[in-house]
Amino acid sequence: MKRQALTLIPLLGAAAAQSGPYGQCGGNDWSGATTCVSGYVCVYQNEWYSQCVPGTATSSSTTLTTTTSATTRTTTTTTSTTSVPSSTNFPSASGLNFTIDGVTDYFAGSNSYWISMLTNDADVDLVLDHIASSGHKILRIWGFNDVNTEPSTGQVWFQKHQGGVSTINTGQYGLQRLDAVVSSAEKRGIKLIINFVNNWDDYGGMSAYLNAYGGSTKTDWYTSATIQAAYRTYIKAVIDRFIDSPAIFAWELANEPRCNGCDTSILYDWIADTSAYIKSLDPLHMVCIGDEGFGLDEGSDGSYPFSYNEGLDFAANLAIDTIDFGTFHLYPGSWGVSYDWGNLWAITHGAACATAGKPCLFEEYGAPSDHCAIEVPWQTTAVSSTGIAGDLFWQWGDTLSTGQTHNDGNTIYYGSDEYTCMVTEHMERIAAR
């Protein structure tokens, strides 16, 4: 939801003679190409993953740019220097369920795109106190905030794309805001889904990359080597900060990735390649896509969301080894279907996940009004559906030091009557199963 750049070439496929830029070129059980196209060299990442990166056989370094405030610093770092996380007590997929802190169950939660943009730590703590008191265990947040020009002092931004250069802001109004959220979540036992880019233009999105590095379409974004290099530089910067954190539920590729009119191979290759890259940096935390669940034959009624028009194949993407669980969203009002239809959407995705042997997370759902009457039946269906292991409504609302958080029509405010039906009573239904 919330709608209002490295560049990557798609993988050439396991049967190709050479792997493309940033493609996999080796690893345990790898049966594909073991050499790279011209200008790229196969570099060992770990025992199960080697990758084609720019350079020759004698060079395997990339240039990263970071900033702590107004000062830009350029450093050269060997590819994939991220250390393996030291803890194994991280959230995980257990059959068709999730395990959190040793408990395997169905888990509820919510979304808060805005919490990582807050500049008052007390507000962050307040919100997470309320979430912890609700019984929720999972919170999905924005891990991106892309800009093309540096905002005025005091404005939060995470990555600037300008003049063909990616600058990562690690300062007070940069990734230190994510630090505050992760630290607060750790203290309260909340687990975070952190995503890396937005399909939509809010907070920059993929358009910020295209503006800086060239291209005009989503296909360009997914297949540009320059854009994907910047994207991966950012991924690594975030993972490096939180690789040992027990508060990370999963790393998420994007918010609602789409490629309208594209062959499904475009997104499939990007998902496979990017998720493998993330696993090479952090093999212990889970990885998910963040998609809406489009492109599914099983149980389809022929409506638009089941089609492959947005370039997604839910079952094929879910089957990728380096994707730990499925995600799907639900917005009937935006998709031209009825609210009751939402129950079919949930059931069919649960069934697809059960077939794949992986859990599904009902990651976003919302309606602009009548939340209890419309959304509680979706929650009830999700809890009773095999293959669905948790749900996160869109979105959490609260009252901060500056007033109420943004109400996009879908917002459920802490302590409201709708909070009672959507959160308190939902947690009771989960406990009573």
UniProtKB/Swiss-Prot annotation:
Catalytic reactions of this protein:
Random hydrolysis of (1->4)-beta-D-mannosidic linkages in mannans, galactomannans and glucomannans
Keywords assigned by UniProt?
Carbohydrate metabolism, Glycoprotein, Glycosidase, Hydrolase, Secreted, Signal
Per UniProt, what is one GO molecular function of this protein?
mannan endo-1,4-beta-mannosidase activity
Q: Which residues bind substrate?
A: W142, N255, Y331, W394
- What are the glycosylated positions? N97
Which BP terms from GO are recorded?
mannan catabolic process
Assigned EC number: 3.2.1.78
Coiled-coil segments on the chain, per record: none
Could you give one GO CC term from the UniProt record? extracellular region
Q: Which residues form the signal peptide?
A: 1-19
Region named Thr-rich linker: 56-82
Annotated localization: Secreted
Q: Name one Pfam family in it.
A: CBM_1
Q: Which residues form the active site?
A: E256 (proton donor), E364 (nucleophile)
Region (Catalytic) spans which residues? Answer: 83-433
Instruction: Enumerate the spans annotated as CBM1 domain.
Output: 20-53
Main role? Endo-1,4-mannanase, a crucial enzyme for depolymerization of seed galactomannans and wood galactoglucomannans.
In the record, the note on similarity to other proteins reads: Belongs to the glycosyl hydrolase 5 (cellulase A) family.
Q: What is known of its domains?
A: Has a modular structure: a carbohydrate-binding module (CBM) at the N-terminus, a linker rich in serines, and a C-terminal endo-1,4-mannanase catalytic module. The genes for catalytic modules and CBMs seem to have evolved separately and have been linked by gene fusion.
* Protein name as it appears in the record: Probable mannan endo-1,4-beta-mannosidase F
